[in-house]
């Protein structure tokens, strides 16, 4: 084999926290929270891996912000719709939003655009052969991006841009009109959007 990927799962660790003794609800070991990071017990919040949601450091950071804002009486909610996920391999594997399979399972009629990373001149210049692929998952009815995946070096540096488009439900036609600096690897996003009719 040329490449081997070993993946270990994660699970929340809520043992020995005494949560059951105060009545905090757990689901498969995860602390149940609402979109404000509140548990069912007033004054108790749960962020990070313990709530079993996204289980990524950058998600935990945002969940903590939401919890603090809620505690301070400021309006804020947590959305998991466009949390980027990255495997820091060579090349990197990045994803945000829904995969094609997840979108179809939700009953969405989707189009998929796959383009080689060679569409980005800078990517080709900085990566021998320009190997890699970028994929957009597009809701055909709403004409918005619902997901993206990339197998490409430094895809972690541009995948969050797609996350913003997903979170704000930016129409694909506006993405096509967005001007990206040239030469950048992030141009691949617009290039893929332009492949959708």
What function would you assign to each model-found segment?
Residues 24, 50, 83, 117, ...:
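Hydrophobic pocket-lining residues within nucleotide cofactor-binding pockets
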Residues 38-39, 43, 79-80, 126-128:
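Solvent-exposed alpha-helices and their adjacent loops that cap or buttress functional pockets
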Residues 29, 84-85, 134:
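Small-molecule pocket liners
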Residues 76-92:
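Flexible, acidic loop-helix segments that line cofactor/substrate-binding pockets
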Residues 58-81, 108-110, 167-172:
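Internal hydrophobic alpha-helix adjacent to the cofactor/substrate pocket in enzyme cavities
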Residues 72, 88-197:
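Flexible, glycine-rich terminal cap/loop adjacent to redox cofactors
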Residues 3-72:
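FAD-site-proximal beta/loop scaffold in flavoenzymes
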Residues 4, 82, 131-133:
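Short beta-strand-initiation
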């Amino acid at each position: 084999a040329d490449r081997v990927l070993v993946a270990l799962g994660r699970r929340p660790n809520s043992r020995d926290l005494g949560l059951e003794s105060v009545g905090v609800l757990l689901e498969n070991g995860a602390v149940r929270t609402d979109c404000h990071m509140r548990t069912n017990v007033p004054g108790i919040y749960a962020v990070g891996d313990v709530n079993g949601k996204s289980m990524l450091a950058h998600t935990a950071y945002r969940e903590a912000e939401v919890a603090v804002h809620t505690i301070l009486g400021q309006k804020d909610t947590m959305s998991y719709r466009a949390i980027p996920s990255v495997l820091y391999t060579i090349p990197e594997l990045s994803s945000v939003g829904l995969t094609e399979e997840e979108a179809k399972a939700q009953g969405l009629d989707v189009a998929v655009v796959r383009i080689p990373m060679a569409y980005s001149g800078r990517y080709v210049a900085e990566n021998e052969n320009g190997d890699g692929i970028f994929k957009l998952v597009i809701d055909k009815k709403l004409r918005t991006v619902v997901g993206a995946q990339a197998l490409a070096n430094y895809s972690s540096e541009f995948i969050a841009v797609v996350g913003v488009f997903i979170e704000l439900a930016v129409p694909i036609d506006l993405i096509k009109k967005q001007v990206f600096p040239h030469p950048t690897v992030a141009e691949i996003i617009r290039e893929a959007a332009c492949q959708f009719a």
